[in-house]
Regions:
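N-terminal secretory signal peptides that target proteins for export/translocation
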Residues: 1-6
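Bacterial N-terminal signal peptides
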Residues: 9-22
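Active-site microenvironment of metallo-dependent hydrolases
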Residues: 19-57, 62-63, 72, 113, ...
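Divalent-metal coordination cores built from histidine and acidic residues
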Residues: 83-88, 92-99, 104-195, 214, ...
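Structural recognition of the beta-strand scaffold that forms the well-ordered cores
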Residues: 94, 119-122, 147-150, 225, ...
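Polyanionic/metal-chelating signatures
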Residues: 133-140, 155-171, 177-181, 197, ...
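Divalent metal-binding pocket/active-site signature
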Residues: 184, 188-242
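Short, small-residue-enriched loops and turns at beta-alpha junctions
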Residues: 199-204, 230-235, 261-264, 294, ...
């Protein structure tokens, strides 16, 4: 209990103390009026994160650690919180999150903690802060409501070495310098290497460059998270390159946002899974993450893999592969905001152009302003998503983040729990929770997170399995999820009954 200076009015002191005690009791009903750093959560359905069946019980936390779980009774002085039969699980770990800028503007991370995320890994797809040490120091000075970790981005490192002269294969001395910088980033606290090989900077790298940088990360105990070179017609070829990199670098894999993103590969999920399963059976440490939507969010150039953005035939094929121009929607375009929230087909019609001509116009307008249009592409099918999610080696991850103009930024984890578990019965509840907790913790080599066990970090989420659901949409992507009742980060309550508490106990987790 906070102490107060003696004032002239003892009555004022009594009133103030009574008021503060009442507030504390509203958040945590107590067995007595004594304060304590121990919290007992009773009457919970405990999901331990391993995939084991849920069990009724209680969980005791002291400070930032879980002390015990099971059949427990209150002890004198500890705060008691009644879960009233709700599920209590480890906090969700988002292994692919884009909140680098959002954490500065919104450290309470409301869209993230409202869906149960307690740790968000930054710097995926090859783009990370630099230097890593500076970013970590800044985050520690300005903590968020959730924990963060960070990749060393391959494209970021490539630009450090090659500058703007990156549109070519790197020389051997340049590759060696990239490996050295990867070493530096890992020494400074990065948890692995990420790459984005569909994006411009990373797309010019060859396999040898990626092996060299991945090997440097592996030597420091890191893993390789990759947005592979193609998720469309050449998805199988790109997958084989990923496997080759992992084999040569001796590094564990996280295949980012596994998908089959064009008409030509729709329905081939089980063929794709077979290639991965064969690699896993011979010993490759291969996991993947997946978001629960049939639409992706990126820049407008990624749909043309040969980079011939003003070639009519290349653009025509790209749009056909997506299923048509009505499947591509502009989300952000600074040179002409009037394009935003319209499909390419709608824009073409209103401007009396063909979809190909409209695409090329947007490319030219963007290049003139040194920017690119943000787009959402509706180019996956549900049966492929289902097949991927039902694999035991696939994790849940958002590929979203604070302020992202895609519903996955605010809805990913509740969407899986509400739609894929409760409504569609694709997954059992324990298995879905495992994909959000202990499986990403395994990839990150964090044995004290992602599980409910004695000694583990008290990152926790309490939710109602009957009501948890995403509410974010493509029209309103920031709408908060429902059904997440309470979230604890490092033992502190950060989300309570639909509102942030204002606490910011998040830490930076380093390798």
């Amino acid at each position: 209990m906070r102490s107060f200076r003696r004032t002239a009015s003892s009555l004022s002191l009594v009133v103030l103390l009574a008021f503060s005690t009442a507030l504390a009791r509203r958040a945590f009903p107590q067995t007595n009026s004594q304060s304590s750093d121990t919290i007992l959560i009773i009457n919970a359905q405990l999901a331990d994160g391993t995939g084991a069946p849920l069990r009724e019980g209680a969980l005791r936390i002291r400070g930032n650690r879980i002390v015990s779980a099971g059949k427990l009774s209150p002890t004198s002085g500890e705060r008691v919180l009644d879960a009233h039969g709700l599920v209590l699980a480890p906090g969700f770990i988002d292994i692919h999150n884009h909140s680098l800028q959002g954490l500065d503007s919104d450290p309470l991370a409301e869209t993230q903690i409202a869906q149960g995320i307690t740790t968000a890994v930054q710097g995926p797809d090859g783009e990370s802060p630099w230097p890593i040490a500076n970013w970590i120091a800044a985050r520690r000075k300005n903590p968020a409501a959730l924990n963060v970790a960070v990749f060393a981005g391959h494209a970021t490192i490539r630009e450090q070495v090659m500058g703007k002269d990156f549109k070519r294969v790197a020389t051997q001395p340049e590759i060696e310098k990239m490996a050295q910088l990867t070493w530096q980033a890992m020494n400074e606290g990065a948890i692995g290497l990420s790459s984005g090989l569909e994006y411009e900077v990373g797309s010019y790298s060859n396999t040898a460059e990626l092996v060299a940088t991945a090997r440097a990360a592996a030597e420091h105990g890191g893993f390789y998270s990759t947005h592979i070179r193609d998720e469309a017609d050449k998805a199988f070829e790109a997958l084989l390159e990923e496997i080759e990199i992992a084999d040569q670098a001796h590094i564990p894999i996280d295949h980012s946002h596994i998908k089959l993103g064009t008409v030509g590969v729709w329905g081939k999920a089980y063929e794709y899974i077979r290639v991965i399963s064969e690699a896993r059976e011979r010993g490759l440490d291969f996991l993947a993450d997946c978001y629960p939507y049939e639409a992706w969010h990126s820049n407008i150039k990624v749909i043309v893999p040969d980079k011939q953005y003003e070639n009519s035939k290349s653009v025509e094929k790209a749009l056909a592969d997506m299923g048509g121009a009505d499947h591509l929607t502009i989300t952000a375009f600074k040179p002409n905001p009037s394009y935003e929230h319209h499909s390419l087909a709608e824009l073409a019609k209103s401007n009396k152009l063909s979809p190909v001509e409209m695409y090329i116009r947007i490319i030219r307008e963007g290049d003139a302003a040194n920017t690119e249009a943000g787009v959402i592409g509706h180019s996956m099918i549900e049966s492929d998503i289902k097949a991927f999610y039902q694999q035991p080696w696939v994790m849940v991850a958002s590929d979203g983040g604070i302020g992202v103009e895609h519903p996955r930024g605010a809805g990913t984890f509740p969407r899986v729990l509400g739609r894929f578990v409760r409504e569609k019965h694709w997954l059992s509840l324990p298995d879905a929770i495992r994909k959000m907790t202990s499986l990403p913790a395994q990839r990150l080599n964090w044995p004290d997170r992602g599980v409910l066990k004695e000694g583990a970090i008290a990152d926790l989420v309490m939710f109602d399995p009957a009501t948890v659901l995403d509410r974010s949409t493509f029209v309103n992507p920031q709408q908060l999820a429902v059904g997440i009742e309470k979230v604890f980060v490092n033992g502190q309550l950060v989300w309570n009954s639909g509102k942030p508490t204002g606490a910011r106990p998040g830490v930076v987790i380093t390798r």
